[in-house]
Amino acid sequence: ANDNSKPRFWDVENFDLTYSYSKTEESDIDIEKYDKIVHSGAFGYTYNAEPKNIKPFEKVRFLNKKYLTFIKDFNFYYAPKTFTFRTTTDKNYTERLLRNKTEDAIIMKPSVSRLWNWNRTYTLKYDLATSLKFDYAATANSYIDEPSGLMTNQDFYKQQVWNSIKGLGRLNTFNQTFSLNWTVPISKLPLLKWVSMTAKYDGTFNWTASAASVQERLGNTIQNSGNMNLTTSFRLSRLYDNIPYVKNVVKSRGRGNTQQRQPQNKQANDTTSNKPKVNYGKIISDGAIKIIFGLKDINFSYQANNGTILPGFIPEPNN
């Protein structure tokens, strides 16, 4: 029963399919005929997996030592966590015929407009390891070219449309983004348990077509960008706990000063007794430690951004 409950990439629930059809007919004193036909369809696939985390060195005994923990904890996933694909299409056909409102026998010809959109979306989430995660997403928008005017030759129409579909349509825009997050295992080193570090890189790519009438002359426009972010946190309170003397000084609340003041009060009227020696060096050093080591946390962040835009680009991406 447990095996049957595991997600499979061929499970029926991973797929979805929709289709709709609508037709609008209108006419009035000015318009003899107005027909609008819309076909809409969508197909989607979503796979959510629970891949097993592989730890090849988990049972290696000599790696039990503290300074080898980062090797022992090495792990990876053999498959992506999530993959989705979705494609939608909208086919619009509009035919309009104006009414002849003159007394002359004027032949009125209908005007026809066609627009066939085709969108595709891809996403991928892959946890390469527990500390290394990769995300990717892409969207493509294209047009399926149809012969203009009324359909007079059905075979020619089908051939033109099928050739456009096989070429994934005439690409209009293509966008993709990816993100890589890494929790650096620096805290697994014994001397650096008090340090945590994360690194992240985000990248984008955009391709935009120019108008079809000037595309050969002006080309297309591409643009990309990259963002790198490095964040480091120093948990000094954890560091102090590893230094016993500093730990005691930081956590003390002036108890030592109270003990030193009590004998002075008892002997305030005794001018012949020897006054207790005051360790000014210790007082100064402890005070300095409290000031210096009173700082709990330090956070450091580094960020770098870059980008490029290039007009007049001729090639098209594979989408």
Identify what each model region corresponds to.
Residues 1-319:
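Exposed, low-structure sequence patches enriched in small/polar residues
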